[in-house]
A protein has these predicted regions:
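Hydrophobic h-region of N-terminal signal peptides that target proteins for export
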Residues: 2-11
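Contiguous, structured surface segment used for ligand recognition
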Residues: 10-136, 388, 411
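Substrate-binding groove of N-acetylhexosamine-processing glycoside hydrolases
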Residues: 14-30, 198-201, 207, 249-261, ...
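Catalytic cores of large soluble enzymes that bind and process phosphate-bearing ligands
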Residues: 37, 41, 45, 98, ...
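A structural preference for short, hydrophobic beta-strand core positions in alpha/beta folds
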Residues: 62-63, 212, 317, 365
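Solvent-exposed loop/turn segments at secondary-structure junctions
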Residues: 100-102, 144-146, 175-178, 216-219, ...
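N-terminal small/glycine-rich loop or linker at the start of catalytic domains
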Residues: 126-144, 364-373
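Substrate-binding cleft of carbohydrate-active enzyme catalytic domains
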Residues: 135-319, 329-331, 337, 393
């Protein structure tokens, strides 16, 4: 009797989940994984399949003569763009699609289908029909605040989002483009025109459009700090380009023209233009008073469109200015795409969507990974934000999503963001609601290539640690807490409300589970989970140390005149606790450097590593201060207040 090897749709750990899966009865012999293709098979799809299947030890694809391939691709014009049918049975896979993108997405589903049965891999016999709910599924990566991907990691990022059916990649650039005419604002390891061109071509191979995002209004301090451009600043060496200063338009004209030359004819070009709060407060005061703030803003967008429209790209802009004054929509080109960015666990995002819809503009929803300023993303917040916003975007039939990853403080890691990023990818592709529980069940197999639910549990455990550390009134702050002086009275008072033991136990559980983990796929992302857990553990231990040192020093003070042995013991332990803190920072520094170098260029790394060394140095100096206090006590049998020892006393 033939046995049923088809796996019910509920058991297929695929991200995204296909729209329709029909099980097909087949024998064990018919469950052989198809691994041969004709010479014309999509090379990007082949690269993705080979990368995944080699890592899983399934093996690479082989090229055979036409008519002999076990994976075949057929054209079916009745299917919609990006849609596909995939039939797997009898050791063969048949792909049907109306376009190359659909065929590629079918191959990406095939890549995730194999399941391990005992010691061998098998593929379920299924018929799948699938198509995206939203046309555009774009990842926006901040590459301007410190982390700046190496070319190898840019390519890995693009390959990975393509494997999970995203079709747009948008690097957010403020000053990082190395302009041939205006190189001074850029970091020495910035993105050159040749690199931008190469990334565009590479992305296109994987059916991903590279969408430049060049800030053109606010957030331009790293350009305006250069004296050559300082006269274009709204406020001295500030953040906002004054739109009525010729230097502003001349500079933007040059770099945008050069970026367009590098990327060719992108479908969109994002001009950002968000958070312009200082417009009219400086040298444009009279200009804005005369013309009106919204009119000045709209004129800037019109000017940017004039630069970009000849390329065929539609301009994109953030929506915050329009939400403040919807009348702006009457003044800007109707071809513009408005990117609707709103973060946090809001009850609904429909009012923001409705505002843009009433203006008659196409829009994309831009949820966030909630990773900024955090040791690890605020996963709970990100999932609520993405789930609600994307579901409402699908109901409103928006053009797509523009999933954002930000690095405001320059310390956060791209590799920490895959869980919320890929949830957004799944939610934008699937027509149905994507439950966090189902995504958690599917993620380890789809992303890490392992049948181990512990990976998703650990992601959520790290989110739980963050919740313990951040009360509702304090958020986006775990990086700051990591560097905060635990002996600061204000910080200590806030942290007194935190169950530090619970934080450490939860973090250490993740550390222990990830200590030896090397999944076949994306092993570095697992290492970054370990690093985050260890940093959380060190953060909580730092505040424990401060509390314990205060108690030990108070005990020393109370015994200073009548119990020399107890006093010296307390002082010695205070010193040891500072050494422990020193060692924690110095141990973490190379781990952080390893994680950084996996993904980013070295430019900003020294600045971040210096914080580890400075924190360690402070601990060394405090250890030495306790030793000096000990020596003084041996001569005088008196001790100064703790704040004096810690160099915190008023002069």
């Amino acid at each position: 009797l033939a046995i049923l090897l088809a796996i019910a749709a509920a058991a297929l750990h695929l991200v995204p989940q296909p729209a329709h899966v029909e099980n097909v009865a087949c024998s064990p012999r018919d469950s052989t994984i198809p691994q041969t293709v004709a010479a014309g098979f999509d090379p990007a799809a082949r690269a993705e399949l080979d990368e995944r299947w080699r890592a899983l030890r399934i093996g690479s694809l082989r090229t055979v003569a036409n008519g002999e391939a076990s994976i075949v691709v057929r054209r079916d014009e009745s299917l919609t763009p990006q849609a596909y049918r995939l039939t797997v049975s009898g050791g063969h896979a048949a792909i049907e699609s109306a376009d190359a993108a659909g065929a590629f997405y079918a191959a990406m589903t095939l890549a995730q289908l194999p399941v391990r049965s005992g010691r061998r891999w098998q593929v379920p016999c299924v018929r799948i029909e699938d198509r995206p709910s939203l046309r555009w599924r774009v990842l926006s990566d901040d590459v301007s605040r410190g982390p700046l991907p190496t070319m190898a990691y840019f390519e890995e990022r693009i390959r990975t989002i393509a494997a999970f059916k995203m079709n747009g990649y948008s690097p957010y650039m403020e000053h990082v483009f190395v302009s041939p005419t205006d190189p001074l604002p850029a970091p020495l390891d910035g993105i050159t025109p040749a690199q931008l061109h190469a990334l565009t071509a590479y992305a296109a191979r994987f059916h991903v459009a590279l969408i430049p995002d060049q800030q053109t209004f606010a957030h331009m301090h790293n350009t305006l700090r250069v004296e050559r451009y300082a006269s274009a600043a709204e406020l001295p060496h500030g953040f906002l380009l004054a739109p009525n200063v010729p230097l502003s338009s001349e500079y933007l004209g040059r770099i945008i023209t050069q970026e367009l030359a590098a990327v060719g004819r992108p479908p969109f070009f994002h001009v950002s233009s968000d958070e312009t709060a200082t417009l009219g407060l400086g040298q444009t005061r009279a200009y804005v008073a005369q013309r009106g703030r919204s009119a000045v803003y709209a004129e800037h967008i019109v000017a940017m469109n004039r630069l970009i429209a000849p390329s065929g790209a539609r301009i994109m802009l953030w929506d915050d200015g329009i939400q403040q004054d919807p009348a702006i929509m009457k003044l800007i080109p109707h071809s513009a795409v408005i990117v609707n960015w709103h973060y946090g666990a809001l009850p609904t995002f429909e009012p923001y969507i409705a505002t843009i819809a009433r203006g008659g503009f196409e829009q994309m929803a831009a949820p966030g990974a909630s990773n900024w300023n955090e040791i690890f993303p605020a996963v709970d917040t990100a999932m609520i934000n993405e789930r609600r916003f994307i579901d409402e975007a699908k109901q409103a039939r928006l053009l797509g999503i523009f999933q954002t990853v930000w690095h405001d403080d320059g310390e956060t890691l791209y590799e920490a963001t895959w869980y919320p990023v890929l949830y957004a990818a799944a939610a934008a592709w699937q027509s149905n609601d994507v439950s966090p529980e189902r995504f958690a069940a599917d993620f380890p197999s789809a992303f890490f290539g392992v049948d181990d639910a512990g990976y998703s549990s650990d992601v959520n455990a790290l989110g739980g640690v963050l919740r313990r550390l951040e009360p509702p009134e304090l958020y986006e702050q775990t990086d700051s807490l990591f560097w905060a002086d635990a002996f600061n009275a204000g910080v200590a008072a806030t942290m007194a409300k935190v169950d530090l033991r619970a934080v450490r136990l939860e973090a250490e559980s993740v550390e222990e589970r990830r200590y030896f983990s090397e999944p076949p796929l994306h092993a570095n992302a697992a290492f970054v989970m370990f690093l985050a857990a260890r940093r959380y553990d060190a953060l909580a231990r730092k505040f424990q140390i401060a509390s314990e040192v205060r108690a030990m020093y108070a005990d020393a003070l109370s015994h200073a005149h009548d119990d020399r042995e107890t006093t010296l013991r307390d002082l010695r332990w205070c010193r040891y606790w500072m050494w422990e803190l020193r060692d924690a920072y110095e141990e973490l520094a190379p781990l952080y450097a390893r994680a950084w170098r996996y993904e980013s260029r070295d430019g900003h790394l020294a600045s971040n590593l210096e914080r580890y060394h400075l924190a360690a140095q402070q601990a060394i100096e405090r250890a030495d201060a306790f030793e000096r206090a000990t020596q003084e006590y041996l001569h005088s049998t008196t001790l100064p207040p703790l704040d004096v020892v810690l160099n915190r006393a008023n002069p």
